[in-house]
Amino acid sequence: MIKSVVLIMFGWSIVYAVPKTVPQNTNIVKDTFTLYALDAQMRHKYYQAFTFFDELYKQTSEKEYIYQSLQMLEQSNDIKMLSKHTTDALNKFPDDEVLQRYKILVLLKEGQYAEASQKAFIQSEKSQKFADYLLYAETRLKLGDYAGTVEALKKAYTLNYDETTADRIALIKYAQLNQKSEAIKFLKEHIGIHGNSHILGKRLGSFYADSGELDRAVLIYEETYDAFKEQSTAEEALKIYIYQKNFTKMTTLLEKSQLNDPLLLDLYVQVKDFDKASSLAQKLYEREDNPLYLAQSFVFKYEGASNRNDPAFISEVVDGLKRANLELEEPLYLNYLGYLMIDHDLNVTEGMGYVKRALEKQPDSAYYIDSLAWGHYKLNECVEALRLIKQVESMIGIDEDEVRDHLRAIEKCKTKEK
């Protein structure tokens, strides 16, 4: 919970045992043992770090090292040792505020919440300092006194209006005291006066969403994302747009946040924005080296083209799809490539080979059978073409324009052949 009642440690690491011979020069002692202590701390060897800081205090008599040694005992979760050394330190410095906080912390860890609360109250009333109000709030929270927790947090909040305390006040009001409107009002006022933050904007958005005010929720999520560029906030906005099926807003959000490019690609395809879809698929291919995206890039390039009969353009698309299908072996793209070659008379036999590979994987696909029928038609093999297109008709009917056009053309081919 609250662990800011002690001094914040810096740290980096190398691990050594305490030397048996202590250097006599005070500066050498401090520098050497400080390095040892920081090394142990960064390696999460907290008891070892404690021994170094404890030795530093013995060699220098600087009270700072008492605080740091106690912090290491707290980090090691050795409550018994923490209690003993806190008591020893208080015997030497009974009026020390930091040591009094450690005493309260020990009581909390021992589960003596009422005594901890009593001492924390006296300490906070006496010092009227931020850390003591936070510690008192923690004791009230342990006792389940949510109203008392909020009151203590408010006293801390008025000293510096920090966002973490504001967030805790709002969360307890909303979740524990059921003061939902007050919690929302409090956060709005804080943001209006002291400015927004990633934490508070996301919290306010979650309150709105939980209350069913999705438009307000997504607005604050978007504003917070625009200000701080935190992806998790964009994710919350995206969830709402997905729920609302607001594809336009979803697309705009995904474009600026780059949160989910595969989803953005799907959205481009849904609205038939094939130019953007092709560019994005190419970007995804370059980033992930996935041949699926290479295939999609050329499919969308073809679908979005204004002149599909340009020989150079068709050749570019076919070559791209061939490259993709070297690794991909997906029936959808094998058939697409094969049909493209058949329809544009670019080596019809080779195109039929791609279609047959697709049919090996999905032999009951009416669309792949239709492609094969069209290949036989292009080769003037009208009997086989008619047999296949009639099979397609029996499977899916002729409601689709392309199937109906193929059937009519092949029936004429059959008639002509007679």
Language-model regions, residue ranges each:
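N-terminal leader/linker segments that initiate helical-solenoid repeat arrays
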Residues: 14-87, 91-98, 118, 411-418
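Alpha-helical repeat scaffolds
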Residues: 20, 49-54, 79-91, 113-125, ...
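Short helix-capping/linker turns of helical repeat alpha-solenoids
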Residues: 28, 60-62, 95, 128, ...
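Amphipathic alpha-helical repeat scaffolds of TPR domains
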Residues: 28-32, 63, 259-262, 289-305, ...
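Alpha-solenoid helical repeat scaffolds
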Residues: 34-35, 64-69, 98-105, 131-138, ...
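Register position in tetratricopeptide repeats
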Residues: 42, 72-76, 109-110, 142-143, ...
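Solenoidal tandem-repeat scaffolds enriched in leucines and small polar residues
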Residues: 127-235
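Alpha-helical adaptor scaffolds
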Residues: 299-311, 321-360, 371-375
